[in-house]
Amino acid sequence: MNNEANEKPVLVIPCSGIGKVHGLISREATYLVTGELAPGRTETLCLALLVKGDAEAVAAVRDHACITIDGCPKACAEKNVEMAGGRAARAIQVAEAFKEHRGAKPGNATGLTDDGWAIAREVAAAVAGEASRLRGGEEVTR
Amino acid sequence: MSAETLKVGIISCSGEAIPEGTISRLATRRVLELLRPDATVTLCLPLFLAGNEAERNFAKTHPTITIDGCDKQCARWGTEKHSGPVSGALVVSDLLGTAATDCRRSSRGASQVDKEAIWAVAEQIAAEVDRVLADAAPPVGAGMGTSAAQCACSSPIPGGKLAVKGVTVSIPGLPLIFEQCVERSIPADAGGSAALLDVVKIYHCILPEEEAEYRSALLAAYQDFRRGKNQEK
């Protein structure tokens, strides 16, 4: 990652999975990062645009450092970034965050409970930290 | 289409970058959970690229409706390219126009404007589901089995029961319907019973001659629901 790339916002791309709460957490964590924790230093784009092969979206993931947030092991966000010719500098799995929250009731794919928001905030904080390190030129080992 | 395709597939765009994407996603969820729980299934759009053959065959095995946030129509494009022609395609920005201007991307702190936009789109999706099912005209009693590509989210939500003319009637998602009525400030008295009936009729078939009985039963159940909510506070 060169210096020019480091000046660009890091793209945070969630899977937004529609079937389970994990997908909603990935999405809301992204909004927490891009809207609150690291506005201006991070941005998001529509994963569906990558699925479509939109030229601007494809160019964006190739030209920017990317962090993907996936709800399940199918890792759709990470895989679609890679299929578009980009690379996820860090690929986060929401399910990993659940390991620290045994017994939590996070809500469902439509809405988050307080437990769900707490997990989303933890994921968001991790993403913001990684984005900061990426912009500083330190690429995180996956 | 096989008999297994009696359920309509709904594919929503992810639309992370725009509020219409969030509306698309949440309206789709509402149809799956509440409006047409027994008639719909879904699949994550990105799975068409990242998934396996069963997932890519989704639109070949289900009549499918795509819900897109904007006129780029990524869900429609992705579904048709990787899975097959769709039976219907809705675009939230066309449906809502400027009504989505003040909507938010995050569901956190959703305003009344957000909620009404989601309901409006959900009702349009439900109507499209009905149209597709009517067009498909599957044989009566054909299998309602699930597909290998179906998400776990498509399980029906628990309903509520009413006693109408001495008969117990189950209404899918009744607690959620009541929750919505509370949000819309529908009063739990005779003045609100007509609005209550109108809302429930969206989700449950009520014949004109049954309306009076349903109105009384719904009002009583709604009053119980409100009392329960107040006791929780």
Predicted segments, located by residue:
Chain A
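Iron-sulfur-associated redox domains of electron-transfer enzymes in respiratory
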Residues: 1-142
